[in-house]
Amino acid sequence: MTLTGRATASADGRDSTEPRIAAGEVHVWVADPDALDRDGTLGGYRATLSQPERDRAAAFRSEADRLAFEAAHGLARAALTWCAPAVTADAWRFTTTPHGRPEIVGQPPLRPLRFNISHTAGLVACVVTLGAACGVDAERVHRRADPLRLARRVCSPAEYARLVPLDDPDARADLFFRYWTLKEAYVKARGYGMTLPMNECDFEIAASLPAGTPTTVEGRSVARFGPRLRDDPARWRFAQWRPGPRHLLALAVRREPGLPCAVVVHPAPPPLP
């Protein structure tokens, strides 16, 4: 996976109706829902939501959960319009697969836009590609929680064996969430949700993870899949980073033969035209 750093906010000189995304590119946006609300961006995003999305948002009892839902879905619409400026943010229409993965309605079959969103307390994320299956997972690391009970179910035996000897609860929680976000991003990219056995994904990752910059996790040496997944880890590229001190973000993208896999992390949420 090639990391191209952060996208520039300057105009690229192309016709505003031309797609800004090319095959082999992976565009990622992250944002704080509260910050979007404070600066007024969320109000614009909220106006682009469909009536079913507004109804779902209104059903949340928690104000924080409602803001995160609106921010994630508004961010997705703005990001898709950034990639394809000929379509306004409120014009995108979506359907869901039998396992709940959102897909765009009415696209050409050859290299359609693919996207995925994630939201957690204090962070929303969106990834967009041209044709490549993709998944993103954002999590706030709960350092006080002991993850071993859940780890028995979702971690591979090798991953679980690495967690158990860690005496520091913060270190154990951090490593567990690193495994969890990579697995979540992968199963979301596959489009089968929790029906895929997470413990069949085995990641061998470095103990430290720097903040801010995506770190690649790729190849058979660090990702191994069990037979029930019916998949080849060599076909996938993973990245993981800390967008802030309390959050982890993981990305999974299916590699297309003959194409690069260039991750572009945008410095700010996309504005609405």
Predicted regions and their residues:
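Core catalytic alpha/beta fold that binds nucleotide/phospho-ligands
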Residues: M1-P273
